Amino acid sequence: MAYLTDDKASGPEWALLLEQCISHRIISTEFRDFSVIMMRRHPISEKALIRIVLEARSATGLMWDPLIPLYVEVLQKLGYVSLPEILKTLLLFSTIYDDSHPVSKAGPNGKGVKRKKKTSTLMTDNKIIQNVMATITMGQGPKATRGATDVLCAVADWISTLLAWSPSGEGPESDQPGDILGHQDGACIFGSLGLLLVALVGTEKGVSALSSLSKKDRKCLGQALSSYTPICASYSLPLRNRLDSIQKDFNIYPSDSSKGLEESMMGDVNVAVLQFESNVVDIPTTSSRAGLYIYINALLAGRPLIDDSMFLNYLNNRYGGDHISMVEELITAAFDVLSNGMYRNESSKTMFLFRAFLVNKLPPFLAYMSASSMSQIPMEVCITRALSRVDPNTFPSFSETFSMQGNSVLSDVRQEFLFSCALHKLIPESSIERLLGENPMQTLPVGGQFMKDTLIAQINNNPERAEQLLNGIESMEGNAGAIVDAIIEVMHNLCSRKETMTLKSICNSLSRRPQTLDIILLFKSPSFILQPLCSLLDAWKWDEDQGESQLVYDEFGSILLLVLAFKYKYDLTPLDLGINKPDSFILRLLDTGASSQQLKDLTEKQNQNLGAWITALFVAEGISDESMSSCSPQEFYLLVATLFSQSLTACEAGKMEFETLKGGFEYLLEPFLLPALVMALTWLGNHIWESESDLETSLKILHGLVKPASISGEAQEIHRTVLCIASRTLEATLKDTRARHPSRTDISPILDVLEQYHSFRRTGATNQTELDSWRANPAGGGLVTSIRNTFSSLVLWSTDPEISMTPPSYTHRQMLAGIGHVGSERVLQGLIDELKLQTETGSGNLAFDIAATLICAPMAESFTLEQILYRQMDQDKYPLPGCRMLTLRDALGIQRESLSKLIEADPHRAELIIRLHRRVEALCSIPQIAPGDVDVGNIMDSIHLEAVGGDDEQREQHQQQQPDADQSNQGVVAPTGNTPGNLDAMLDAAASAVVADPNGTAGAEAAAGAGLLGNGVGGDAGVGIGTGMNDVFSLMDMGNPEFIDLDMEDML
């Protein structure tokens, strides 16, 4: 019903009502009835009414009064004020606006007069904005496009003003825009505004408004979003991504002048995509047995890609709160991977890694998972069920091995796993016999469970203890994790204290144990391990007077060799190594260490160093300490390739005898110089490959360095590590050279020596035989068809895995080979083709889970970058490089962004892509810990729901807590019917309960009994807000004292 308004006459009456209601703490249901009466007697415009309500809050002088948001909500529900007007006027009366507009009018002297500093309104502002968002989410938003447009413009004004606001109060120039996130209340408003915009765009009128914005409004909103989204990346990545998508889909940018007609016309198509997507209903999710089987295979296909937090986050995304299924299927999958490895005849080193994951990694991870769970996980039950599902032929009992024909490779694995579980307190030791079904043939380790701090203390007291621990790190007893933690922490401490002698000993021990490096990466990332080592090498101070130079070279070389062993074994990038400085010595060595320089390009110091080393190696009788003291280790390693180039050129030109050259290079077989052979052999291999003339001298030198006639015992282990590092590169160049010079007989002996070192590298690359088998598909289609066949076999096995406990043959190297040889986009097309086929045959649920897992599975090329993004580390100081290749997830994102044409051509395929993209993003979602403890993820999920319902049990408990308050309302004089009596009389009657006791005690109790505390401070306001929505948005109120028992006496 419309009223003729007279703001001038009605304003004082409404102001009096608000003053009385606030001072007497009138609950929202009573305020609603009073407002109905008041509007009939004293009609008023919405602009004047909302101004009066907001002005009334200043009378309390409190930062937070819960009644104000409730009163505003009541008036909005009654239709007396609209959502756009609430937001517009709220901004004008906000602390943010006051601080951003300090001058209000000219004074008598003509100068501006600053406003008086008022109590902060931010907590109230935030709650009102949240209520607006709740209203829109529950389908009670603007009914017309114009109203939605006004809300968008109001939000844009809020964002612009908020970002111009100075939290420090010293003016906008004193703070950076991102500083708003450091202010708790400001950060809450920042998040609420973004979520409000997302909520509005989720409605039909919101989409219509965005599609029909005027040029002025589009520019205003575009400017606001362009300023908001960069800061939002530090607040919530899902929110930022959603706003980015909105801005792109609706072409909302500050200026449209640079955009062509074709791009502008895409707006309608993008809206159609959004509408199409909103009609795509997700199918029920299923966790197939093949899912974790694929994922663990991917974790261990190359270098171990394990980050406990990320892995647990993936498992939580996959299983939700079903911890029992999570644990049971995780154990089962680990056994399946080991079983598959045996049937595929994987290498002994791969089988060792699979076994180490099951025995040494999984039990402590389960203990970590159990400790972080809010509810107790029945581990023994889970383990019992998991063991009942593993293939008995692959994991026979000890007694069964006697009746089997040699198939007892994994006979000890079950009891190794169980004893490791007992070691980590997952099960009692007494349960092992029952779980095995026979008497165990081993016991718990003699020393029991190792503790990191104890081991560190032992190493500090006796450095030789580190060597003893490393000798036992590869045993299958369950203590590897503690050993790794202790060794790495000791290394980091030695780096910080620059105790390089002890550090050298540990690095040498690790360098000669390639399998130990695999074990270490089950527990620690390469960047965590190596960053302190790289920093130490980068910052190594060289003093010519520091003492024995050979000892310094020895220590430096040992540390460097371990870094190089990690780098070449796992094909690590500078980001993987933890290098973030462009002038890093390690970075320069990796980039240019194997490349020689022309003499004219050397600096004077480099020329001096080069001459000194040539003299020491080929002229003098040996390398003296004096000849080394003038050249730092860093300078020497960067000169090695040039030293070889100049020396070999001199020999080939007849300026140096071959025996002199050979004898000089043999000095590099001394332990303190041996690591330099990595650069020397790499350069020499490239030189041989590039040479078209005489190769005699180069090949003789290479053979002498690869297979020296004599070498000391200490140097043998280092030499073996050097050949492990350089063998792959040398093999490729020598095979190509042999193909060009088939008559030469001096190349094959070198290749024969290098062959034993090929298994050193672990990168997930496939061998040529395996690759050819995947390409040679009888049906055609090559690698992609082979991947589809593998996909199909995984779906078939997951349909009923109990029929065949033996898992289908699978290696994630096949996926990696497909991505590397034909590209992620073609592999993805094959997966979607097979997904479509499986969906049509009734296996859609399982196929979606398997396809999503294949896409989510980690890759070495992107893993470190994903780790950094997962932890949201500071990326401003050192910008992150892009991923080395397009991942399957990236390719799916591109498919998702280009659906407009596919929707018309193949809507079924478009639906598959949308569902698959949702499933992948759900599995890969990162938990956001936003400022103010705002659970943005839950709120975002709620916004996309058609209806938000509360938890029935919580609602029941809430109702059980309210009966006393509801009953006590009967004793309060409240209006009845639609035509209550005299307003003043009713106000006086309502206030009588408050003022009955002159001391205020009874008044406070009466107020509480009347439901003022319960309803006025976060209870049921009686204005149509459901409990479910209150639950959803309650986490946004951590900055507000709604959850504190307010002192009502002080408020009266």
From Swiss-Prot:
Compartments where located: Nucleus
Compositional bias segments (type: Low complexity): 959-970
InterPro entries reported for this sequence: Mediator_Med5_fun
Main localization (coarse): nucleus
Signal peptide: none
GO biological process, alphabetically ordered: regulation of transcription by RNA polymerase II
A GO term from the CC aspect: mediator complex
Protein origin, superkingdom: Eukaryota
Keywords assigned by UniProt, alphabetized: Activator, Nucleus, Transcription, Transcription regulation
Region Disordered, residue ranges: 949-982
Disulfide bond residue pairs: none
Pfam families tied to this protein: Med5
Function statement: Component of the Mediator complex, a coactivator involved in the regulated transcription of nearly all RNA polymerase II-dependent genes. Mediator functions as a bridge to convey information from gene-specific regulatory proteins to the basal RNA polymerase II transcription machinery. Mediator is recruited to promoters by direct interactions with regulatory proteins and serves as a scaffold for the assembly of a functional preinitiation complex with RNA polymerase II and the general transcription factors.
PANTHER family cross-referenced by the UniProt entry: MEDIATOR OF RNA POLYMERASE II TRANSCRIPTION SUBUNIT 5
Subunit structure as annotated in this protein's UniProt entry: Component of the Mediator complex.
UniProt protein name: Mediator of RNA polymerase II transcription subunit 5
Organism: Coccidioides immitis (strain RS)
